[in-house]
């Protein structure tokens, strides 16, 4: 079904350092899942191009470096799919999801 996501997304706010070809730029995260994320940037990224993202879901998390595939860009919002997210980084994302869920119950 079109529009159905492979996994649930949840909000995340962190700074992202990006490299796409010759471009190096900053972005602000918007939401994330175990399969990808979206972020806001002024950079123009072609759909189906690859980029490298560096970010920390929380200040106490290790730096995550992941190769991504650009799936969409509408205005300043870019959607990407993770291509090589390591298992331990997926665990940090699951903990982030649990923090978001716990914060929503208060």
Model-derived features with residue positions:
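Short conserved beta-strand and strand-loop elements enriched in small hydrophobics
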Residues: 14-18, 49-61
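N-terminal helix initiation/capping motif
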Residues: 1-32, 47, 94-106
């Amino acid at each position: 079904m079109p529009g159905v996501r492979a996994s649930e997304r949840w909000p995340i706010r962190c700074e992202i350092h990006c490299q796409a070809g010759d471009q190096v730029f900053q972005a602000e995260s918007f939401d994330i899942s175990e399969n990808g994320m979206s972020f806001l940037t002024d950079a123009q990224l072609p759909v189906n191009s690859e980029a490298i993202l560096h970010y920390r879901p929380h200040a106490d998390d290790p730096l995550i470096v992941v190769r991504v595939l650009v799936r969409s860009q509408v205005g300043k919002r870019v959607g990407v799919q993770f291509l090589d997210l390591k298992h331990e980084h997926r665990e940090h994302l699951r903990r982030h999801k649990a923090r978001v869920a716990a914060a929503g119950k208060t």
